Structures are given as C-alpha cells and as structure tokens.
Amino acid sequence: GYGRLGTIGDALGIELCEPLTFKGRMGTGSPGGRDPYADPALRLGGQEWRKYRYTYRLWGRLLYNPDADPETWRRFLRAQYGAAANAVEQALGAASRVLPLITVVHGLSGSNNAYWPEIYTDMPIVEGPHAEHFRRDTDGPPTFTGASSFDPSMFYRIDDYADDVVAGRRDGRYGADVVAGWFETLADTAERDLALARTQVADPSDPEFRRLEIDVTVQAGLGRFFAGKYRAGLAYALYLRTKDRAYLQEAVSAYERARAAWAGIVEVTEPVYRANLTFGTGLTGHGHW
C-alpha cells in the first residue's frame, strides 16, 4: 500500500492534505464554517475533523508501519459500531477504493482546480457541454472516450481499446470493460456489507452511522455511474467503428444505468449536504451532485 511504497525513488514518505483543507478557499467561505452538512442531526458543531477519525487512524498507523496490527483500528470500529464493526470495515474497504480507481483510470486533469471526481462534472461521450473546460488539460478529442488515464502504460484510452478490439489485437493493457467490472465489484461489495451493517448496528439512526451510511452509498453510486459510463463509452466507440446498431443500443442502455446511479446519489445527498459545497470558484470547485 501507500506506506510500503512511500519511499520508492528515495521519497521521504507521503504528504496528505486534511480532507477539508480547501473548504471555503478563494473567498468561498459561507456562514456555518466548514461543516458540509445541511441536516442539523448530522452537523458536527465546529469539530468537522471528527468525521475523519477513522481515516486519520488508518493513514497514521499504516504510513508509519505498513504491517501494523489491525487491532489498532478495529477496536475503534467496535467502540463506534459494536457488532457491526466488521461489516463497516468491509464496506469502507470497498467503497474507499472507488475514488482512487476513478482518479487513476480517468485522468482528466492533474489540477485540483480542474478535476473533482467526487462531484464529477460530466465529460460527454460525444463532444458537447464543458468541452472547452476539459480541453485545457486533456489531449483531444475532449470526450470521455478520448481521455487518457494517469497511467497509460497500464490502461487503454477507450478509443484506442476500441481500435484494437475491432482489429482483433491487444497489447496487454486493461480495457474499459475490465475497469467497469472493477467498479461494479467494488459497488456490489460496499452495498452488501453496508446492508449487513444496518442489521447489526445498535441504532441505525445514530448520526455517526448515518454519516458513514450516506458516504458509502455515494461512493458505491459513483462506482456504478462510472461502470455504466465506461461500458457506454466503449459500446459507442465500437458503434462508430463498425456501424453495428447493437452497440449503439448497448451504449444507450449502459448510459441509462449510469444516469440512474447518479440520480440515486442526488436522492441520497440532497436532503443532507449543503446545496453548494465550496472548495473554489471554478466549474469544478463548488457545487452539489
């Protein structure tokens, strides 16, 4: 993991930004401080860092010692969630892999001012809205299928993968269908273990559990959105190359699944998060799902 590889190339370790480092930057602060919640029951009373106690514990322990005893974080989970501790750990373990996977396979920009995968500004499969925003830091064409990963030696661009599929060749890199499968597996695992946690936790309405439940649901939804988007992008790219309408129908169906996943995120977050989460001034610096 990060701790074990943090000294690769003579690096001195890993530098972390506290999760709300940029909240309210560039003059975008608002009444209520850094608390992201609109729901009074979930607000943290000026102690927003408490939401991330488990995050800090994992990073601190495992950056210092990649072989740390799991008991050092599991006792915290037992204290917080009782009999649901193991299910919570498993749900978070799957859900927390979704955003790092999105970030590496869908490399829209290396700038945090231009790319916010948590609250994604949709990059169209066909050139359309926001094209100029993406064009600044993305090789053309500024479409979802034309976007590179941050590790192009490991992952195909969708357009390049479609070219190779049609030509009947492969070069060993991971394609869009494989990536979509990973997103689906992570979402399935997170949702399964979260459902188990709901049945085991003493009080499912407890704010500590509700905050976790909402965020795991959102991350699983992001996994399903990007799974559908990758499958839609690949099917559409194959349609353009073959003119086989079956691929076009497949693209539409996959995109409908992606849209449904995104709508599910909106349904979950709209009542609980503030309407405008401000981390900056640009298109990808503030907003809501």
Where are these regions (language model features)?
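C-terminal non-catalytic alpha-helical accessory regions
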Residues: E18-H286
